[in-house]
């Protein structure tokens, strides 16, 4: 038990140090959540699809100041409770998406980007809306809500409703290249 107490203290001081470092980042840097044409964003984070936890990894490429295209892989944990085994391949969805970025239209601060769009994946197709906030020129956070509307190409006989009709929430970090 004593070891756990020290580990918890270590984690607390680790997060405190990280938070302190973030506060020391110069605020004079021109952080932009959306640079427009040629901008590349890579993001990764926690995903929750209909109550199932997982991870998400994706990228956006800006075609213009308003439109981007990209791809995304989402994986959620799918467990077959009847047989007690994981069904790893049933939990993924690979999607292509297109987004419209509202920053210039809404005259938002350059550190903030609000977007909406559509996606088509191996399991489902849907609509999404999201927001990005950049702390620095390269690093930021994002949050996204996606409503998976209908089934597409995936053959999910046993787990057909992992994505279909479910709301997906995701939060994480974004990196600009």
In which residue ranges do the predicted regions lie?
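Outer-membrane beta-barrel "beta-signal"
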Residues: 94-100, 164-177
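Flexible, solvent-exposed loop segments that connect beta-strands
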Residues: 33-40, 71-94, 112, 151-164
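Solvent-exposed loop/turn segments connecting transmembrane beta-strands
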Residues: 44-55, 82-90, 117-128, 163-164
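Gram-negative outer-membrane beta-barrel proteins
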Residues: 48-52, 77-83, 104-108, 124-126, ...
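Repeated loop/turn-to-beta-strand initiation elements of outer-membrane beta-barrel proteins
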Residues: 66-71, 105-109, 133-141, 151
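Membrane-embedded beta-strand positions of outer-membrane beta-barrel proteins
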Residues: 42-44, 71, 96-98, 114-118, ...
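Cleavable N-terminal export/targeting peptides
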Residues: 1-37, 177
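Short glycine/proline- and aromatic-enriched beta-strand/turn motifs that initiate or cap beta-hairpins
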Residues: 27-69, 96-98, 103, 120, ...
């Amino acid at each position: 038990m004593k070891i756990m107490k020290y580990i918890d203290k270590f984690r607390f001081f680790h997060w405190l140090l990280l938070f302190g470092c973030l506060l020391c980042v110069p605020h004079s840097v021109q952080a932009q959540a959306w640079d427009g044409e040629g901008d590349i964003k890579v993001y990764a984070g926690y995903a929750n699809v209909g109550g199932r936890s997982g991870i998400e990894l994706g990228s956006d490429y800006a075609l213009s100041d308003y439109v981007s295209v990209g791809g995304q892989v989402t994986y959620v944990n799918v467990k077959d409770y009847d047989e007690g085994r994981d069904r790893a391949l049933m939990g993924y969805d690979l999607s292509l998406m297109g987004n419209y970025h509202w920053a210039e239209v809404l005259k938002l601060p350059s550190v903030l980007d609000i977007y909406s769009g559509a996606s088509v994946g191996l399991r489902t197709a849907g609509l999404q809306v999201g927001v990005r906030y950049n702390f620095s020129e390269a690093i930021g956070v994002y949050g996204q809500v996606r409503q998976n509307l209908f089934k597409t190409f995936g053959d999910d006989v046993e787990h057909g409703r992992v994505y279909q009709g479910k709301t997906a929430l995701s939060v994480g970090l974004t990196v600009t290249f």
